[in-house]
Structure formats: structure tokens, C-alpha cells
Amino acid sequence: MFQKVEGIVIRTTDYGETNKIVTIFSRELGKVSAMARGSKKPKSRLASVSQLMTHGHFLIQMGSGLGTLQQGEIISTMKEIREDIFLTAYASFIVELTDKATEDKKHNPYLFEMLYQTLHYMCEGVDPEVLSLIYQTKMLPVLGMRPYFDTCAICHQETDFVAFSVREGGFLCSRHAEQDPYRIPVGEAVHKLLRLFFHFDLHRLGNVSVKDSTKKQMRLVLNTYYDEYCGIYLKSRRFLEQLDKFQI
């Protein structure tokens, strides 16, 4: 059976001297993998369409196991991302998180649209670190996690938030922050932005400017929470951390 899908390449794996296995997150099927035979040859008709982060239409011969990529038509190569090492690093984090957080052939058009929109914004020049924070926040419910972003994790009141508790699973107000000695102190902007990112429609993203100190706190909160509850190891996250040391 042949299936035509719109999708984005989120992972490629070399297979032999000339082949690649491409993993595509598609609008129609969710995550699907297929053998792209001969795609490592420069003159192959599958060479360009099987590149990481390529957005296109793909014709896949489906089977009980691994499918075969028959042909593809590029919609966007995301060249703005490919030409910038920092954009590539953040985009790699986003597609790897998508890959690690999803199962094969689980239809999720909402997630496809979120992935596409995030990479599209990145190509348009929106702050890639902010986009990665938004994406990481919005992936929480996909992974079955819902931290207390709206109320204090202990008293469940909407009040002044001064810290984030991984142990309690959310923000803590000033009255209960002392109950977790390992709490992460945060500024008011961190709470407001994480709550906003969790709930808002990504299509409505306008001009966004976030202080570096706020982004750093948000990253600490999210990474620590993911490490405790998710158990996903991302090579791209380590690469990002190394790149950040050299970014001016």
C-alpha cells in the first residue's frame, strides 16, 4: 500500500554505504520511518528530500515493518536554519524531542502543526531559544505531564510565586516555598511566561523579547523537571549547552 503524507524529517540514520532510514513526523500518520534507498548518493532523487528538517510531501510504500520512501517533493528545505549553527542546534533539539517523545504511527495533527510552526518562526528570525522554551513547555502534556503552572503546587491558590519545586511538581507561593529545600528560586516573569507558553495558541505568537536571565531560569526549571519525570536523554541538549558557552 502506498501512502502520501505531508511531513518533516526529524531523524536520519545511515544504513549501509548508500541508504538512509528517514523518520518523518507527518500530518496524516504521526511518526513514520522509511528506507530511502540510494539517498546517500549525490545524484539520487531522494538525496535532498531526505535531509534533516526538510518539509515536504512523501510517498511511502507501507508494509508490516519498515516502509520504503519512493519519492518526495520539497515544500521547504528550512535553509535559514541549515545556514546558521545556532539555529541548527535549537532546531535539532526540537526535532529530537519530538522523536523521543512520540510513538510510531500515532496520529497527532496538533503536534505536527506545532512542529511546523516552530521551525517556520525560526526561519523568520524569531528568537530560537524562546521558541525552544515554548516547544519544550508545550510538549509536557504530550508526555503526560502537567505541572502546576497556574496555582501553588501545595495550597492551590493563585498567589505570589517565588520558586519552582520539582518535588511538588510546580510553582510555590511565598508561604510554602520553604517546604522544599531544593526549590528553584524564580522571578515573576518566569511564572508568567511558562504559564503563558503552556496555554497560548502558538499561531498567535507576536514579537517576543525575553531577558537572558529569565530564559536561563526557565531553561533550568524545564530541564530539571524533564530530568526528574521524563527520562529522555537528548544529545542535542548537550550540544546546545556547549554552544551556549561560546555564544556572545
Curated annotation (Swiss-Prot):
HAMAP family: RecO. Coiled coil: none annotated. Belongs to the RecO family. This is DNA repair protein RecO. NCBIfam families: reco. The lineage of its organism: Bacteria, Bacillati, Bacillota, Bacilli, Bacillales. One of its GO terms (biological process) is DNA recombination. Pfam families: RecO_C, RecO_N. It comes from Bacillus cereus (strain ATCC 14579 / DSM 31 / CCUG 7414 / JCM 2152 / NBRC 15305 / NCIMB 9373 / NCTC 2599 / NRRL B-3711). The keyword Hydrolase does not apply. Signal peptide: none annotated. Involved in DNA repair and RecF pathway recombination. Keywords: DNA damage, DNA recombination, DNA repair. It comes from the Bacteria. One of its GO terms (cellular component) is bacterial nucleoid.
